[in-house]
Amino acid sequence: MTNTEDKPYCIIDILPEQVPMYSPGRYFTVLRYFSSRLDEIIGKFASLLNKLNCYCHLEVGWDSENYTDDFAPEALERLFKAANSSPDPLYIRVNSSDAIFVYANGDHYMTLYEPDSELLNLVRSLASAEGLFVWSPPSTPTDSPSL
């Protein structure tokens, strides 16, 4: 994936929406708390994707060019954990299309680039079942989509 800046995307997250920059809450304190529970969050991401793999063909890769679909369901969680100690993100391509999940080192969220409406609706349902949220960032270029 070379240029993601102009591609439509959504966030699969533990929070229901982006936290405003000047929120009166304790975002960083809460984020540190969830850092200690990252394995649990990764388990939810892996479970969501394993369920999605019942409906869609998934391929995983460490770069945006080379993918494999030869992975066991339990391997997905190990791949997420490996991404936490890697400078390279984990890519999960859907149906050999442009729709790609990206998970980077230590993040509490995944990004889904270029989902069509059918995929997005399915991901929303599966995320909800895992206690996760799917939201789209503000469309203004000055707002950062990352947590």
Description of each model-found segment:
Residues M1-Y109, Y113-L147:
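Structured alpha/beta or helical-core interaction and ligand-binding surfaces enriched in interleaved
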